[in-house]
């Protein structure tokens, strides 16, 4: 979900259409480069088609157009149009092979809190199921975490988090939302980076583990460590890179042995 730290106000958007290469759910571009919403949308549809070739994407297309209109003139700290964020949330959900209602909810997860669009309008356009998902994500985003008591209250907060979501898909959308926010933390202040990282370590990563979503859990852990204890993280990266040739040689030896049989 977005807060004051995620928005950079309004300004005219300069369209910088550039080729976007996407590898394992990440955009391979320099941080200062813009990502074109249309290219990201096509990447989303390609992902959906991969696990559901006959999927009816009409609802997803409609959600994208409505979300883009609702978030127009809104920008993230990075300077990107705000629609980039819900698009990435939807892409993460597609990587998890979620149904179209969940992907649509991911695309619209911020509209009730951050725009003039209402739940009744979402229900009228997309049905009650999607509206309930968006409502659930909005309510989870309103949970207050006490920085001073977060560690002591972590288990109770996790239980509250799980209890508030009547549909497990609400939590999955929220995890996807947090994951993309963590991926773009370089645009936040150091204090906010540490605060969000601690929340993620204590609340979000353990919930992802409980749900068996190891892919998200692992990345949340990595990103949290990167911003909460950057010295430790950088040392780990250095050690892993130093051992990379050794690991690659070992893998090649194993492959060679297997090939003999």
Language-model segments: residues:
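Active-site helical microenvironments for divalent-metal-assisted chemistry
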Residues: 2-261
């Amino acid at each position: 979900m977005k807060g004051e730290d995620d928005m950079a106000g309004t300004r005219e958007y300069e369209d910088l259409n550039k080729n976007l290469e996407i590898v394992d759910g990440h955009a391979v571009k320099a941080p200062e480069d813009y990502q074109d919403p249309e290219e990201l949308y096509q990447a989303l549809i390609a992902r959906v088609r991969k696990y559901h070739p006959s999927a009816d994407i009409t609802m997803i297309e409609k959600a994208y157009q409505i979300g883009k209109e609702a978030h127009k003139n809104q920008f993230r700290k990075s300077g990107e149009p705000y629609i980039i964020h819900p698009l990435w949330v939807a892409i993460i959900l597609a990587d998890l092979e979620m149904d179209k209602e969940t992907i649509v909810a991911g695309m619209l997860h911020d509209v009730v809190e951050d725009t003039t669009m209402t739940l009744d309008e979402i229900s009228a356009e997309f049905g009650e199921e999607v509206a309930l998902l968006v409502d659930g994500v909005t309510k989870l985003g309103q949970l207050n975490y006490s920085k001073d008591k977060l560690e002591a209250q972590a288990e109770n907060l996790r239980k509250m988090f799980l209890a508030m979501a009547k549909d497990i898909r609400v939590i999955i959308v929220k995890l996807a939302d947090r994951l993309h926010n963590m991926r773009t933390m370089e645009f936040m202040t150091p204090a906010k980076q540490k605060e969000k990282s601690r929340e993620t370590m204590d609340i979000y990563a353990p919930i992802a583990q409980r749900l068996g979503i190891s892919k998200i859990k692992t990345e949340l852990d990595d990103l949290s460590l990167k911003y909460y204890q950057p010295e430790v993280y950088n040392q780990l990266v250095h050690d892993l890179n130093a051992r990379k040739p050794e690991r690659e040689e070992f893998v090649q030896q194993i492959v060679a042995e297997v090939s003999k049989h």
